[in-house]
């Protein structure tokens, strides 16, 4: 395993509270402190602080984010700070996911349906590959990192080392490749496949798009190994020896598979006896039919659809024992940074119960064996046993993190940019819509943006319609909008294609929009989750990246949460102003690129192989996409992509595969245009 040092590339030096926070965290880690909090306000450079801590400690790190959007944003930033090190991205690879489920009340079985994002799958493989081959690794992950992934021991054991001069016949290598889930395809050469031409075998590893390995044989010996461009065949360089990692994280050798299949049959027999003794013959027949079909597929192909449901048997685990996950791929001394910990920690704790509830019904009614319950996310207690030293990062850390850290807190209140927390003003609810309309018009005239939060979906919809009727360009952000469309709407706001964004619970953490100079909170005096002290402080922070930032609370009374949030904001504002005066700094609005956080994801997935997709370029895609049918705005393009995805899935269900392939290629082309837009 390569032991390379982290090298931080930046023209900036730590300033403000950053040097003290970095020194305090590094010292605590050196003294073995297990849990601590980095309490940093919006715009104070928490990511820069974390990067400096990683570089100083020189240990592998996991950055845990609460959603894909924030994970992509962090991945982008860490790649820029550590260009010479392995910064990888690990989130759910599903573009669309409908889990398997059963509704007893209506006797409705819902089959699993999903669409896997090939780019994200490649990046997941790149993440585990990096962890097994080097130590200078930063993985930015979502809560997907606590879901079952397959044993790292089996994964590492089944690698295929190849070396020039090695006695290794082509037939033996092809057999090994098939065992670790590579597929032979002499016509459609893409990631996870290999092809053979005479005495030459070429393979694209699961963690690459842009490079393939060419292995040349002389008899039963490996004569030469080269890296090639999979599209053009151009030789990029010679390789003395290399290692090919499995194409799936759920791999197993033949002996282990035979043992697992025997265990599955034993469990099936036991479960069938239970059903028969309870006279549940329908469930018994259903389970036997489904399980035997899976076993036949495993016997013939080495895997089956939904093989992860048998992961307990494949791993040789006891009933109830937690599965392996990404955390098990890290060395024991890794560092964990939990971003937006007040959201992420409860999210980690909630995953197990939701998954268990759905699968218990499938098991009870004979759709799955009881062992399927052990293909699950970690319980919170299991998560805690797998993590090492942890830094919880938030502007509003939760009670659990504060208790866990026992008062070990590094505060980061000063913003190096000099930006102060926004002025907070309380106004009465009487006439609030007209007052808000005037404020929005004033901001639009200055080419500034406005965020408005409401308590209900109905109110958000009505307000959006009213403001639109009054001549403002306004968009509505709600929970039904997927990640890509949400980013398109935010980009439209930043570009000035709309002036106002209305939402409910989506305008808090992680929205980095420097163009926003006004945040307006309606019904601010309605105590509850959306109007708690932490929620209010987070929402205030959306106006903290603009020198003219201001917050208006519409309320008839000042609640305890409002008072606490305003007092804390005032404290931070005063401290920043004092620092600015002492250092002669004039606050200036942040200037930020209009690139989306996902730009780095797609560029990383196709780096060095622009336009190659799955190794075929854009040959099957239409030469020109008719933009007139959906418009040119990012929001319209995102909606059109969703429409095409629905049509693609419908075509696949109807076995119209050529049409589905054409739609798929149109979607790829549109996604590229959306990123470039």
Swiss-Prot record:
Transferase keyword on record: no
* UVR domain: residues covered: 638-673
Where is it located? Cytoplasm
Sorted keywords for this record are: ATP-binding, Cytoplasm, DNA damage, DNA excision, DNA repair, Excision nuclease, Helicase, Hydrolase, Nucleotide-binding, SOS response
**Stretches assigned to the Helicase C-terminal domain:** 432-594
The residues the record assigns to binding ATP are 40-47
The listed location of motif Beta-hairpin is 93-116
Q: Does the keyword Nucleus apply?
A: no
One Pfam family named in its UniProt record: ResIII
Q: Which GO terms describe its cellular component?
A: cytoplasm; excinuclease repair complex
Taxonomy, superkingdom: Bacteria
InterPro entries registered for this protein in UniProt: Helicase/UvrB_N, Helicase_ATP-bd, Helicase_C-like, P-loop_NTPase, UVR_dom, UVR_dom_sf, UvrB, UvrB_inter
Tell me which residues make up the Helicase ATP-binding domain.
27-192
Q: Which GO terms describe its biological process?
A: nucleotide-excision repair; SOS response
**GO-annotated molecular function:** ATP binding; ATP hydrolysis activity; DNA binding; excinuclease ABC activity; helicase activity
Stated role: The UvrABC repair system catalyzes the recognition and processing of DNA lesions. A damage recognition complex composed of 2 UvrA and 2 UvrB subunits scans DNA for abnormalities. Upon binding of the UvrA(2)B(2) complex to a putative damaged site, the DNA wraps around one UvrB monomer. DNA wrap is dependent on ATP binding by UvrB and probably causes local melting of the DNA helix, facilitating insertion of UvrB beta-hairpin between the DNA strands. Then UvrB probes one DNA strand for the presence of a lesion.
Note the HAMAP family from the entry: UvrB
Q: What is known of its domains?
A: The beta-hairpin motif is involved in DNA binding.
Q: How does it assemble?
A: Forms a heterotetramer with UvrA during the search for lesions. Interacts with UvrC in an incision complex.
Family assignment from sequence similarity? Belongs to the UvrB family.
Q: Tell me what this protein is called.
A: UvrABC system protein B
Organism encoding this protein: Nitratidesulfovibrio vulgaris (strain DP4) (Desulfovibrio vulgaris)
- The gene behind this protein is uvrB
């Amino acid at each position: 395993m390569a032991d390379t040092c982290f090298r931080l590339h930046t023209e900036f030096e730590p300033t403000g509270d950053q040097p003290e926070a970095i020194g305090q965290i590094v010292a605590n880690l050196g003294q073995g402190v297990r849990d601590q909090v980095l309490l940093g306000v919006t715009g104070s450079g928490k990511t820069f602080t974390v990067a400096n801590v990683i570089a100083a400690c020189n240990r592998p790190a996991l950055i845990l984010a609460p959603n894909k959007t924030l994970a992509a944003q962090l991945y982008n930033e860490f790649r820029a700070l550590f260009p010479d090190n392995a910064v990888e991205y690990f989130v759910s690879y599903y573009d669309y996911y409908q889990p398997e489920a059963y509704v007893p009340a209506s006797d409705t079985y819902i089959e699993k349906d999903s669409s896997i994002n090939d780019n994200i799958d490649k990046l997941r493989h790149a993440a585990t590959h990096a962890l097994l081959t080097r130590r200078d690794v930063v993985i930015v992950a979502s809560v997907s990192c606590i879901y079952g992934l397959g044993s790292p021991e089996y994964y590492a054991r089944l690698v295929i080392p190849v070396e020039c001069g090695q006695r290794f016949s082509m037939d033996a290598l092809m057999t090994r490749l098939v065992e670790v889930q590579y597929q032979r395809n002499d016509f459609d050469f893409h990631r996870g496949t290999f092809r053979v031409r005479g005495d030459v075998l070429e393979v694209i590893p699961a963690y690459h798009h842009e490079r393939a390995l060419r292995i040349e044989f002389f008899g039963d010996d490996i004569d030469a190994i080269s890296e090639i461009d999979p599209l053009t065949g151009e030789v990029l360089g010679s390789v003395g020896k290399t290692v090919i990692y499995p194409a799936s994280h759920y791999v197993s050798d033949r002996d282990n598979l035979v043992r697992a299949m025997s265990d599955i049959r034993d469990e099936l027999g036991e479960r069938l006896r239970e059903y028969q003794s309870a006279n549940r013959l329908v469930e018994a027949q259903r389970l036997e039919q489904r399980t035997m079909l899976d076993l036949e597929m495993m016997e013939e192909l080495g895997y089956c659809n939904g093989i992860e449901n048998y992961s307990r048997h494949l791993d040789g685990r006891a009933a109830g024992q937690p599965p392996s996950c990404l955390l098990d791929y890290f060395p024991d001394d890794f560092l964990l940074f939990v971003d937006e910990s007040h959201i992420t920690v409860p999210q980690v704790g909630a995953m197990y119960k939701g998954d268990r509830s759905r699968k218990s019904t499938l098991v009870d009614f004979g759709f799955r064996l009881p062992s399927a319950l052990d293909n699950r996310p970690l319980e919170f207690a299991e998560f805690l046993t797998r993590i090492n030293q942890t830094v919880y990062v938030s502007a509003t850390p939760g009670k659990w993190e504060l208790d866990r850290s026992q008062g070990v807190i590094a505060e980061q209140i000063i913003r190096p940019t000099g930006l102060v927390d926004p002025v907070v003003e309380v106004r009465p609810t009487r006439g609030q819509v007209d007052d808000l309309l005037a404020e929005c018009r004033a901001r639009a005239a200055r080419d500034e943006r406005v965020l408005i939060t409401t308590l209900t979906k109905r109110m958000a919809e009505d307000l959006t319609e009213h403001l639109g009727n009054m001549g403002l360009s306004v968009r509505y952000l709600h929970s039904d909008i997927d990640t890509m469309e949400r980013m398109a709407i935010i980009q439209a706001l930043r570009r000035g294609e709309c002036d106002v964004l209305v939402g409910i619970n989506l305008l808090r953490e992680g929205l980095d929009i420097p163009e926003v100079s006004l945040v307006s909170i309606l019904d601010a005096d309605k105590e509850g989750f959306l109007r708690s002290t932490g929620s209010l402080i987070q929402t205030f922070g959306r106006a903290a990246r603009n020198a003219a930032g201001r917050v208006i609370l519409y309320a008839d009374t000042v609640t305890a949460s409002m008072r606490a949030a305003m007092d804390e904001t005032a404290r931070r504002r005063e401290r920043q102003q004092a620092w600015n005066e002492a250092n002669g700094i004039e606050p200036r609005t942040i200037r930020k690129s209009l690139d989306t956080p996902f730009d780095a994801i797609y560029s990383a997935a196709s780096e060095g192989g622009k336009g190659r997709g799955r190794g075929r370029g854009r040959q099957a895609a239409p030469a020109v996409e008719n933009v007139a049918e959906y418009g040119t705005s990012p929001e319209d393009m995102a909606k059109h992509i969703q429409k095409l995805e629905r049509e693609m899935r419908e075509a696949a269900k109807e076995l119209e595969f050529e049409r589905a392939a054409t739609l798929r290629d149109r979607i790829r082309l549109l996604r590229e245009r959306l990123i470039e837009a």
